[in-house]
Amino acid sequence: MNKFFYTVLIIILSIYQGFSQFTPADVQTNSILLYGGSLHIGNGEVIEKSAVGFKDGKIIESVDIEYNQIDTSYYDIVINVTGKEVYPGFIAMNSTLGLMEIGAVRATKDYRETGKFNPNSRTLTSFNTDSRITPTVRSNGMLIGQISPRGGIVSGTSSVMRFDAWNWEDAVVRADEGIHMNWPKNRVNNNVNNELDIEKVKSKVKHTQNEIHDFFQIAKAYVQKNSLTIDLRMEAMRDLFIGKKRLYVHADKVSQIKEIISFKKEFNIEKLTIVGGKDAHYIPELIAENEISMIVSRVHSLPSYRQSELDISYKLPSILNKAGVLFCFDNQGDMEQMQSRNIPFLAGTAVAYGLPYEEAIKALTSNCAEILEISNYGLITKGKSATLFVSEGDALEISTNKISHAFIDGRRIDLSNSQEKNYLKYCKKYGLIPEK
């Protein structure tokens, strides 16, 4: 009986999901010109009256129409975006979007593997292009993302994916671009007040650090030796030691960051990014000196300590920017898949607390592309991918972020989603908005 019930339930859910899926956009066949909009290039510059033309998925011109004559007849489609804002597609960093659909169902959680060391665990093939959450994220300007693993000590490898595709092969922008590791926390709970328990915590942290060092030493020796015996975990680490992969270390405390800097030097790791870094405001110059980039997690969060300034999380991006640290934003934490849509508003809060506006745009676009080494994205300049969107107002402000057009590699994206459809459905039912 139970088997029959579950079989019927799976069939019903499959049919329901089939009807609810959005069809990916077709490859660009017509040349398109966005005319008259205020263009945020993604490099800190703005063109108040711009023309952006793209063909075959590539930008062919990006100019100021006050100083350049544009032949609009060259284009198959001309879209007047006067009075609107044009941005490069925002990039969701350190995201688990597409790796989990229903939090209460363990079988849908594809972002975590069992065990401590899983560098060969790939998010690439687990990415679900049919997630019902993805369209809700796209409609706020998040068009591509770094899909990252969680759990263990070495969690696995992340990949960069498009948020409109038929399958993971179709979605991939850059496969297996980095390895994620969780640095141990030297954390003692407030209710632990005897020295024996404190020493136990410190001993556990030291043991984990030793495990990390041992694993990296074995991996480095494996790479140098070129063993005939294939070890998949060690093979996944190979590109890290030759500078082809980036190491993302998840950590928040000053002590952790200092330990990570020493670790970077010890193993001669060329590319390293700290994810989280809540206490980075204490040592921004040290981070910059060691050429470490940062993914700032959840600007909308409380400070770590009672004595901290209440708004220090909001100020952190500005502090890092002044120190010359390359940084970007993520929304790691509770309900992070659906919360990815709010990443632009984290940047907006940072602007209100001292970060220059165009630096905030860079932290959502070109900074991300630089860290991920996807040079085709993050800028609206000639030769780059036509991954961009048009907003009726400021895209970093909740009340004015209203996307009218979006393109991924020149393909015009469907911006509707199930939540918006339900909103309009019930507004219409109760006469809250006029019928269109």
Residue ranges and their predicted role:
Residues F22-D26, L39-A51, D64-N68, M338, ...:
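Acidic, glycine-enriched loop/beta-strand segments at the rims
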Residues K49, Y222-I312, E370, E392, ...:
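Active-site core of metal-dependent hydrolases
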Residues G37, V52, G57, G83, ...:
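Divalent metal-coordination and catalytic microenvironments
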Residues M1-A25:
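Bacterial Sec-dependent N-terminal signal peptides
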Residues T29, H405-K436:
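Extracellular/periplasmic ectodomains of large secreted or surface enzymes and adhesion receptors
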Residues I102-G103, T108-N120, R246, A288, ...:
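His/Asp/Glu-enriched, well-ordered alpha-helical/loop segment
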Residues R138-K271:
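Polyanionic/metal-chelating signatures
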